[in-house]
Amino acid sequence: MTAMSSLRVPQSLAKRLGIETGDAVLRYELLQEQAASLGLAGRKVEKALAALREHEGEGRAEVLKAATDAVWGFLVQREIMGLRDRAAIIAEYGIPREVMNRIGAR
């Protein structure tokens, strides 16, 4: 039986040569998952806010709660990822003041 030795390219050289190390591949896959998850949360917010805009009268409290939960989850997820610019998101998604008030944001 012959023993195999493992040979690893130094990280400094790997970066300059553009060689993907296991760590780089893992980071890339994690970023892909984060982006996909954030996109899904954003679509959930869009859907919940559309339902809120269309819903008046009886049952609005439940729709408002669903929209608030979706927005809160989305904002928390963004903050965990280091994306802290709430004002741009509020403007982009057209998040109503009543939703932000329920979250407790100023």
Spans of model-derived segments:
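Amphipathic alpha-helical packing elements
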Residues: R60-G104
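Conserved ATP-utilizing enzyme core subdomain
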Residues: T2-A14
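Peripheral, non-catalytic segments of secretory and membrane proteins
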Residues: Y28, A105-R106
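N-terminal acidic leader/helix
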Residues: G22-H55
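Short, charge-rich amphipathic alpha-helices with coiled-coil/heptad character
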Residues: Q11-L26
